[in-house]
Amino acid sequence: MKTLRWFCAAALAVAVGVPSVRAQEPPKPGPEHEQLKKLEGTWEATMKYMGQESKGTMTYKMEVGGLWLTSNYEGDFAGAKFYGKGFDSYDAGKKKFVSVWVDSMITTPMFMEGTYDKEKHTLTMTGEGPSPAGPTKFKSVTHFVDDNNIQMDMYMGDAKDPGFTITYMRKK
């Protein structure tokens, strides 16, 4: 009984002594999120990798209060079904775009971050992800040709030429 009285007294002291806590105002989408929102929709994808070409479909959707662009990729790669999922946003604290990618060929996510060049309409991101040789540095350069066409080049390690290229064309 003495312990219960002590606990109640301590709880009352904390409740009276602590100013009321308000819910923090959630972040609101900024101009960078609006840039990502332009990608919403379904895109036909063509991937070129080591002389081979494969096709797929990428679907983008803004979610989580307009703060995250989710992407779902379905297609084929080297004759096998391939699935991928991405999460892209703008980190206002870092002042950088951020990305997480997972797919049916890896069990370790790829994390990337980078900046957007408004004049060149290009998003350049760097990060590290899995490869057959172990953790590898990656760089993606995504050029927004116009509202309906995108080209993404992915560089691995210190390569001067892209390891693969994906072109996207918005489905009408």
Question: Over which residues does each language-model region extend?
Answer:
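Bacterial N-terminal signal peptides
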Residues: 8-17
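Bacterial N-terminal signal peptides that target proteins for export
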Residues: 1-8
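Hydrophobic small-molecule pocket/channel-lining residues, especially in calycin-type beta-barrels
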Residues: 24-172
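Sec/Tat signal peptide C-region and signal peptidase I cleavage site
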Residues: 18-23
